[in-house]
Amino acid sequence: MGLETEKADVQLFMDDDSYSHHSCVDYADPEKFADSGRDRDPNRLNSNLQVGFEDVIAEPESTHSFDKVWICSHALFEISKYVIYKFLTVFLAIPLAFAAGIIFATLSCLHIWIIMPFVKTCLMVLPSVQTIWRSVTDAVIAPLCTSVGRVFSSVSLQLSRD
């Protein structure tokens, strides 16, 4: 409830000349916040996700707002995106990761212990079923269809106008 005496860890640098090329938050001390250099999306699952200011908000040449409005809008967009994303990940990332882990573990278990043994069993039994089905077809269904075909082959229709 007074004046803040601590130095801020995050600063946003926006120049009049380079505001349109700037799309992320610059840290005051990059080494302090640096990740271990590991790519967090090595399989490019979210490569289609475009959340930069220029990807979301654009003004055509014919309609431009004031430069200061554009700069402030850009800064507020980046700050709010940064803060809200961090806030949401603090509260949602761990529970959602836990739920996704449970779902994928359950699906993996079902696939490994139920679905694949069932499929393999069906594939093992199918040649026998195919042989039995062919025998039933040849012994029962083929003679029945042949008899029905012979009965209907002797039917003749004559149309006449009276």
Curated annotation (Swiss-Prot):
<dbReference type="GO" id="GO:0070836">
    <property type="term" value="P:caveola assembly"/>
</dbReference>
<dbReference type="InterPro" id="IPR018361">
    <property type="entry name" value="Caveolin_CS"/>
</dbReference>
<comment type="subunit">
    <text>Monomer or homodimer. Interacts with CAV1; the interaction forms a stable heterooligomeric complex that is required for targeting to lipid rafts and for caveolae formation. Tyrosine phosphorylated forms do not form heterooligomers with the Tyr-19-phosphorylated form existing as a monomer or dimer, and the Tyr-27-form as a monomer only. Interacts (tyrosine phosphorylated form) with the SH2 domain-containing proteins, RASA1, NCK1 and SRC. Interacts (tyrosine phosphorylated form) with INSR, the interaction (Tyr-27-phosphorylated form) is increased on insulin stimulation.</text>
</comment>
<keyword id="KW-0963">Cytoplasm</keyword>
<dbReference type="GO" id="GO:0005634">
    <property type="term" value="C:nucleus"/>
</dbReference>
<dbReference type="GO" id="GO:0031410">
    <property type="term" value="C:cytoplasmic vesicle"/>
</dbReference>
<feature type="modified residue" description="Phosphoserine">
    <location>
        <position position="20"/>
    </location>
</feature>
<dbReference type="Pfam" id="PF01146">
    <property type="entry name" value="Caveolin"/>
</dbReference>
<feature type="intramembrane region" description="Helical">
    <location>
        <begin position="87"/>
        <end position="107"/>
    </location>
</feature>
<dbReference type="GO" id="GO:0060090">
    <property type="term" value="F:molecular adaptor activity"/>
</dbReference>
<keyword id="KW-0539">Nucleus</keyword>
<dbReference type="GO" id="GO:0001937">
    <property type="term" value="P:negative regulation of endothelial cell proliferation"/>
</dbReference>
<feature type="modified residue" description="Phosphoserine">
    <location>
        <position position="36"/>
    </location>
</feature>
<dbReference type="GO" id="GO:0007005">
    <property type="term" value="P:mitochondrion organization"/>
</dbReference>
<dbReference type="GO" id="GO:0044853">
    <property type="term" value="C:plasma membrane raft"/>
</dbReference>
<dbReference type="GO" id="GO:0006906">
    <property type="term" value="P:vesicle fusion"/>
</dbReference>
<protein>
    <recommendedName>
        <fullName>Caveolin-2</fullName>
    </recommendedName>
</protein>
<dbReference type="InterPro" id="IPR001612">
    <property type="entry name" value="Caveolin"/>
</dbReference>
<feature type="modified residue" description="Phosphotyrosine; by SRC">
    <location>
        <position position="19"/>
    </location>
</feature>
<dbReference type="GO" id="GO:0042383">
    <property type="term" value="C:sarcolemma"/>
</dbReference>
<dbReference type="GO" id="GO:0008286">
    <property type="term" value="P:insulin receptor signaling pathway"/>
</dbReference>
<feature type="topological domain" description="Cytoplasmic">
    <location>
        <begin position="1"/>
        <end position="86"/>
    </location>
</feature>
<dbReference type="GO" id="GO:0060161">
    <property type="term" value="P:positive regulation of dopamine receptor signaling pathway"/>
</dbReference>
<comment type="function">
    <text>May act as a scaffolding protein within caveolar membranes. Interacts directly with G-protein alpha subunits and can functionally regulate their activity. Acts as an accessory protein in conjunction with CAV1 in targeting to lipid rafts and driving caveolae formation. The Ser-36 phosphorylated form has a role in modulating mitosis in endothelial cells. Positive regulator of cellular mitogenesis of the MAPK signaling pathway. Required for the insulin-stimulated nuclear translocation and activation of MAPK1 and STAT3, and the subsequent regulation of cell cycle progression.</text>
</comment>
<keyword id="KW-0333">Golgi apparatus</keyword>
<keyword id="KW-0597">Phosphoprotein</keyword>
<feature type="modified residue" description="Phosphotyrosine; by SRC">
    <location>
        <position position="27"/>
    </location>
</feature>
<dbReference type="GO" id="GO:0005901">
    <property type="term" value="C:caveola"/>
</dbReference>
<keyword id="KW-1003">Cell membrane</keyword>
<dbReference type="GO" id="GO:0007029">
    <property type="term" value="P:endoplasmic reticulum organization"/>
</dbReference>
<feature type="topological domain" description="Cytoplasmic">
    <location>
        <begin position="108"/>
        <end position="162"/>
    </location>
</feature>
<feature type="modified residue" description="Phosphoserine">
    <location>
        <position position="23"/>
    </location>
</feature>
<dbReference type="GO" id="GO:0051480">
    <property type="term" value="P:regulation of cytosolic calcium ion concentration"/>
</dbReference>
<dbReference type="GO" id="GO:0000139">
    <property type="term" value="C:Golgi membrane"/>
</dbReference>
<dbReference type="GO" id="GO:0019901">
    <property type="term" value="F:protein kinase binding"/>
</dbReference>
<dbReference type="GO" id="GO:0048471">
    <property type="term" value="C:perinuclear region of cytoplasm"/>
</dbReference>
<dbReference type="GO" id="GO:0031748">
    <property type="term" value="F:D1 dopamine receptor binding"/>
</dbReference>
<dbReference type="GO" id="GO:0005925">
    <property type="term" value="C:focal adhesion"/>
</dbReference>
<comment type="similarity">
    <text>Belongs to the caveolin family.</text>
</comment>
<keyword id="KW-0472">Membrane</keyword>
<dbReference type="GO" id="GO:0048741">
    <property type="term" value="P:skeletal muscle fiber development"/>
</dbReference>
<dbReference type="GO" id="GO:0048278">
    <property type="term" value="P:vesicle docking"/>
</dbReference>
